[in-house]
Structure formats: C-alpha cells, structure tokens
C-alpha cells in the first residue's frame, strides 16, 4: 500500500486506495470522494422478541453519521474559506516553502506550471472547501474539495509536488 504524506508536515493526506487523475500539467491530482454512513451498526443477537410475545425490539440509538471517506480516513481538518487575497498570500508562502524541498528537475517543472494550477484554483475559489492535515500546521499543504456540476460526491484536489510517497 502507498500512502502520500504532506512533504512539509508529514501528515498523511491520501493513499493508493483512492485513485487519482493528474490535471494541469501534473500539478494537481484530482480524487473522487464519496459520502459514507459511519456508525449505525446492526447487531443481531439472535433474540426474537415477537416470537416470545415480547415487545418490538427498539434497538439501540447509535448515532449514524454521514462523512466523506477521504476526510474521515485521513482526519482532514476543514478550514475557513479563503478570499482571493488570502489565497494568493498562502500560495506565495507555499511555493516559497515547497520549492527548496524539490530536486532541481522538479523545481523547474513546478515553477513552470504552478501558475496555471493557481489560476485554475482561483477560478473555483468560491466553490472550494479547504482542508489541512491532522496536525493543522500553517505551512502544510491545503487540500481542496468541490462539487462538479450535478455531482453528489465531492472531488478533491491535491498539489502533486507537495506529496511524498511512502510504502507501507
């Protein structure tokens, strides 16, 4: 199994259990999330109250919760939305922090293509939800989620060059 960690913080953000598609010259990974029901365990203990003349089984009140699989699995923490100025400030700081961590070849590609990916994200800014890894570190990678037209499940966007592949 492969796990993808934030290159700057070490937070686990994704695994190969969630297939991705590269977009914007490989700068972003697009991953489909799914809403899932967590909790609501149906336990059959073998009792049959109706056959024994007892009352109808009322069960247990176990709180079923609807969560997004990626957010739940990697304990992503939702952040308040950014306005354009905040987002541009974040991107400048992120590029400054990430670039030295990349090898020379990746630095060239990153510098060449990150502007296009940033413009793409800016065009969707009002539709994006923002997440960070479990440590909630300020300098960490942001993970973005949005809903494509007509979709009921969110699509997540990751900065590909901000992820480090770890074999488990």
Curated annotation (Swiss-Prot):
Ranges for domain TCTP: 1-168
First-listed, main subcellular location of the protein, grouped into a coarse class: cytoplasm
Family per record: Belongs to the TCTP family.
Record keywords: Calcium, Cytoplasm
GO cellular component: cytoplasm
GO MF term list: calcium ion binding
Name assigned to this protein: Translationally-controlled tumor protein homolog
Source organism superkingdom: Eukaryota
Subcellular location field: Cytoplasm
S-S bridge residues: none
Function text: Involved in calcium binding and microtubule stabilization.
């Amino acid at each position: 199994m492969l796990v993808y960690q934030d290159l700057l913080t070490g937070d686990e953000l994704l695994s190969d259990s969630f297939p991705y598609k590269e977009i914007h010259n490989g700068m972003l990974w697009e991953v489909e999330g799914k809403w899932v029901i967590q909790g609501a365990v149906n336990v059959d203990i073998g009792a049959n109250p109706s056959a024994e003349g007892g009352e109808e089984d009322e069960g247990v009140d176990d709180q079923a919760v609807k969560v997004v699989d990626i957010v739940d699995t990697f304990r992503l923490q939702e952040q308040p939305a950014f306005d354009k100025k905040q987002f541009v400030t974040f991107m400048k700081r992120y590029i400054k922090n990430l670039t030295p961590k990349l090898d020379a070849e990746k630095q060239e590609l990153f510098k060449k293509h990150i502007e296009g990916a940033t413009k793409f994200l800016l065009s969707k800014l009002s539709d994006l939800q923002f997440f960070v890894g479990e440590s909630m570190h300020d300098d960490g990678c942001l993970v973005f989620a949005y809903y494509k037209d007509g979709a009921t499940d969110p699509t997540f966007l990751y900065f590909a060059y901000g992820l480090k592949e770890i074999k488990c």
